């Protein structure tokens, strides 16, 4: 989502509160809870889950392994729920032509660097760059960067943002026009 006027462009960044993260955290929680209950029921010798009789799964080694997977899954699920509740990765990009300042803000993990805030001068922006990256499945992903003098490139889009090449090109062209800088493609 973005908001634009003649002088200011504000781009809101979603972060970790996406539908897919909610689904994965919920599925992982239920699955790991099931594994832990099956492992515990095999240890106790009682049916805590009515799907499997506890006599079919002996505690050593199947019950121990299922309990371990259940505990590990609960830890990973709690990590996902924490990132969702802290909204890690969300924030905004603000481009202010009137003041000549670019502000990039992101929420991080709790601690000393929870708030990540970058303030840059517009005159230091060299270009808007579109780079092609390949993920582990050999898919090509387009990522939008802002090239800054003396500081390198700052990513403006996430790698999981599924924009078509036309949409990415349109976004880069509009931003480059707004900032009055050239576009580079790598």
From Swiss-Prot:
Signal peptide from the UniProt entry: none
Protein name, per record: Photosystem I assembly protein Ycf4
Disulfide bonds: none
GO process terms (BP): photosynthesis
Matches recorded under HAMAP family: Ycf4
Entry keyword set: Chloroplast, Membrane, Photosynthesis, Plastid, Thylakoid, Transmembrane, Transmembrane helix
Membrane association type: Multi-pass membrane protein
Pfam family, one: Ycf4
TM spans (from-to): 22-42, 57-77
Biological role stated in the UniProt entry: Seems to be required for the assembly of the photosystem I complex.
InterPro entries in alphabetical order: PSI_Ycf4_assembly
Chief subcellular location: plastid
Gene Ontology cellular-component terms listed: chloroplast thylakoid membrane; photosystem I
Lineage of the organism: Eukaryota, Viridiplantae, Streptophyta, Embryophyta, Tracheophyta
Alphabetized PANTHER family for the sequence: PHOTOSYSTEM I ASSEMBLY PROTEIN YCF4, PTHR33288
Keyword Magnesium attributed: no
Keyword RNA-binding tagged: no
Species this chain originates from: Vitis vinifera
Compartments it resides in: Plastid, Chloroplast thylakoid membrane
Entry similarity comment: Belongs to the Ycf4 family.
